[in-house]
């Protein structure tokens, strides 16, 4: 069973790209709160956050690509309605 993602057992779950976009927004919010802090520690945290944002953006793009691929090949997901997975096993 998945904890966060939509699945047969978790029809109220969310799509991976939606979770990642929300997480990216949270990181951006944190960045704005430390953007004026010029202490070395804050600058390093900001630099780290920028790298994290790059990785999150890449992960979002990959997840969206997978969703589009599955939509084209098998039609829209029915997992939110308790339907079977489009690929793999339940």
What are these regions (language model features)?
Residues 3-4, 17, 32, 50, ...:
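Residue-level marker of intrinsically disordered, low-complexity segments enriched
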Residues 32-79:
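Short, charge-rich amphipathic interface segments used for partner binding and complex assembly
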Residues 1-34:
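N-terminal acidic leader/helix
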Residues 1-4, 76-90:
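Short intrinsically disordered terminal tails
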């Amino acid at each position: 069973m998945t904890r966060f993602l939509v699945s047969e057992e978790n029809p109220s779950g969310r799509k991976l790209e939606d979770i990642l976009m929300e997480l990216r927004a949270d990181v951006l919010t944190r960045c704005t709160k430390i953007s004026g802090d010029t202490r070395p520690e804050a600058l390093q945290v900001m630099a780290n956050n920028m790298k994290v944002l790059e990785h999150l953006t890449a992960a979002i793009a990959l997840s969206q690509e997978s969703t589009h691929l599955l939509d084209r090949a098998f039609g829209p997901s029915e997992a939110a309605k308790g339907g079977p997975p489009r690929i793999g096993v339940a």
